[in-house]
Amino acid sequence: MRFTPLFLLAAVAIASPAPDLNARHELTRRQASESCPIGYCTQNGGTTGGAAGDTVTVTNLADLTEAAESDGPLTIIVSGSISGSAKIRVASDKTIFGESGSSITGIGFYIRRVSNVIMRNLKISKVDADNGDAIGIDASSNVWVDHCDLSGDLSGGKDDLDGLVDISHGAEWITVSNTYFHDHWKGSLIGHSDNNEDEDLGHLHVTYANNYWYNVYSRTPLIRFATVHIINNYWDSLIDTGVNCRMDAQVLIQSSAFHNCPDRAIFFADSDYTGYAVVDDVDLGGSSNSVPEGTLTPSSLPYAAITALGSGQVASVIPGTAGQKL
């Protein structure tokens, strides 16, 4: 039997998806096993998540909850769309990684009094306030949030939903990188109360690197007591306010830009004491910085330098790289 060239091409086209799919699965597993390479989560022995354990794939809320709350190291790959109304209490030594195109709706992740957790390539939306934050990090250490797409719903009341990434109660060695915060009332909070100095002061070391903030009302982020490095962030079309530095926080903001934002890009409000900021190569886009100069400088950071894109480049780069892009 003779096969025409057209038939052979068709056969190749039909056969090719399987190798491509296998390659995609292999890439997902490799990315899900990666350790945090950037910012404060490289400290204190580093952040490896579930790399020392097995890998499982989950497609529903029950299996996701069971895996995330289990003892021992485990990498959890989220496949497809999972929705519900729940707060998942993530245990230590976990990586939760979203496959390309996966999504989680209405489910919050509570990382409380644990260590060594990675939340990566997840698309999380519309978490009701009863289920906490999209990602809440409370009294925990070594947490990496990377390449996540986090959003809410501005059509409801301001308190119907809580924060997208909130970090509190002396949490330590946290990096939030390559993440897309959008369409929400409350972006990200560090330090939950002006009255929590005894627990928070000297802790709350957080890096925000390469993040995109779009159409967020406030808390981008709000910072109390903490030591925070913000680099290569792009804020676009904020609704009310930008970076709120309060209660003796020390903040370093580098290589970042604001566009189409209200006047208060970097500011202090609503506490008895101001925070402080060193602002280096930041395009305020016509907005203002009213925070006193601080003492946190690049040379005082304990981790490897993060390459600065430059304030003139973040607008063209960060929206294309932040979010569920792995």
UniProtKB/Swiss-Prot annotation:
Keywords: Calcium, Carbohydrate metabolism, Cell wall biogenesis/degradation, Lyase, Metal-binding, Polysaccharide degradation, Secreted, Signal. Gene3D superfamilies: Single-stranded right-handed beta-helix, Pectin lyase-like. It catalyses: Eliminative cleavage of (1->4)-alpha-D-galacturonan to give oligosaccharides with 4-deoxy-alpha-D-galact-4-enuronosyl groups at their non-reducing ends. Optimum temperature is 37 degrees Celsius. SUPFAM superfamilies: Pectin lyase-like. Binds 1 Ca(2+) ion per subunit. It comes from the Eukaryota. Disulfide bonds: none annotated. InterPro entries: Pec_lyase (IPR002022), Pectin_lyas_fold (IPR012334), Pectin_lyase_fold/virulence (IPR011050), PEL (IPR045032). One of its GO terms (cellular component) is extracellular region. It is an enzyme of class 4 (lyase). Its EC number is 4.2.2.2. Ca(2+) binds at D133, D162, D166. GO terms for molecular function: metal ion binding; pectate lyase activity. Pathway: Glycan metabolism; pectin degradation; 2-dehydro-3-deoxy-D-gluconate from pectin: step 2/5. Its main location: secreted. GO terms for biological process: cell wall organization; pectin catabolic process. Pectinolytic enzyme consist of four classes of enzymes: pectin lyase, polygalacturonase, pectin methylesterase and rhamnogalacturonase. Among pectinolytic enzymes, pectin lyase is the most important in depolymerization of pectin, since it cleaves internal glycosidic bonds of highly methylated pectins. This is Pectate lyase plyB. The lineage of its organism: Eukaryota, Fungi, Dikarya, Ascomycota, Pezizomycotina.
